Amino acid sequence: MALFKLGSVVATPGALQFCEQHKINPLLLLGRHMAGDWGDLSPHDVAANAHAIQHELRVFSSYKFGDDKVWVITEADRSSTCILLPDEY
């Protein structure tokens, strides 16, 4: 069940290449993100996301794959969601 809207979904070239190389389906990451499975976040960041959903603030997920991470960020106004690598932020 979706907790919030994603808006327009975009992905950086680096994130798409990483997902392709590691056989990661970006749609599964989006599904986890909007269902409240925010991956590898601290308890503080999990609480911040819960607050963000209630108060229409930015929602952030971080999924770890070995030593690498893929981030998913939904903007506060829910106009867009971006899949990216941390060094592309």
PLM regions: where:
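Compact soluble domain cores
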Residues: 1-59
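Short, compact, well-ordered microdomains
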Residues: 56-89
